[in-house]
Amino acid sequence: MTNPNHPFLAACRREKTPYTPVWLMRQAGRYMEEYRELRAKFSFLDLCKRPDLAAEITVTPVERLGVDAAILFADILLLLEPMGVGLEYTKEDGPMIQRPVRTGADVNRLLEFAPEKAFPFVFETVRKSCAALNGNVPLIGFSGAPFTLASYLIEGGGSRNYLHTKHLIYSDPGAWSALMERLSRAIVGYLNGQIAAGAQAVQLFDSWAGCLSPDDYRQYVLPHTRATIEGLTPGTPVINFSTGTAGLLELIRAAGGDIIGVDWRVNLDEAWERVGFDVGIQGNLDPVALFAPPDEIRRRVGEILRRAGGRPGHIFNLGHGVLPNTPVDHVIAMVQAVHELSAR
């Protein structure tokens, strides 16, 4: 287990650190040659379900990039697989739900499961990753948040307008609430299993919450996200991350979390002021900025750090995941710039 005074964990508690810690969403991904070599030999699900391979993918970016935390290699939709909805991963369309949830009867047909029986491979990956990291940096566990997972279940895949999701919310709020409660319970068990296996922080990904109006988020999402966060193992830092939610920041803060993760569509200083300085903030470089020349990357890193003002509680990250084809040397340059420009 990593020393609790490690800069990443200290930043989660809004304590002073010798520099601003940095990690990246999708830091283990297609932009890395090591990942592509494994992916050429194994399916995506094989990589997720073989702890030896998943742990290798989890740890490699720490060694390669010099980041201050590892994040578990898995997929947010794995949690849906034991519910009996026919989760499939296709090369053409990505993850697809074969039996989408569209009615109250569909919600009632969802299978309950025990996390320790459904996800032994995930928890073993956590243990193997922690052993390989050897206390050098902490491991972050993660899950999709209730709304984003519900949207996948209802839409059957990606969506531009979330028509089916909003139709269920508006036409049958009772079924919607029942679905969100089921998902919240499942997420709590899943994340607490990761924590028990060695994860020292967790992140909730609410990647699709930006499609909601403030009133809809307040009524139909906030209570369930809050219940999820409140159900997690006490003392474990929680990062509440979402995208496209500049209009919802105060509500997201009310939903909970020790750190609020924001994207590049809002200035970091404005976001932090709006959520309050009694929580930490994570972000918020545009992932596309990593395609810029290294001196421009360094300038943009410096601007974000300037907006953070050296205040304890800032964790540097992108506003979303690392994109495929991102130059690895540019990622390394970004990490080095964060460490050098924030040294105190």
Residue ranges and their predicted role:
Residues A69, Q98, P138-I140:
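Short, flexible active-site-proximal loops enriched in glycine and acidic residues
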Residues E92-A132:
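A gly/proline- and charged-residue-enriched helix-loop-helix capping module
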Residues A118-R344:
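Active-site loop segments of alpha/beta catalytic cores
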Residues L38, V85-Y89, A105-V107, L153-R160, ...:
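Surface-exposed, active-site-proximal loop segments in enzymatic domains
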Residues I76-L79, G94-P95, G104-A105, P146-T148:
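A short acidic, glycine/proline-enriched capping/turn motif at secondary-structure boundaries
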Residues M1-Y89, P95, A227, R298, ...:
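N-terminal basic, low-complexity leaders that serve as flexible interaction/assembly modules and, when applicable
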Residues E81-V85, P100, A150-I154:
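Short, conserved acidic/polar surface loops in the N-terminal third of protein domains
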Residues R36-C48, G104-P115, R253:
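Short, basic, glycine/proline-bearing loop/turn elements
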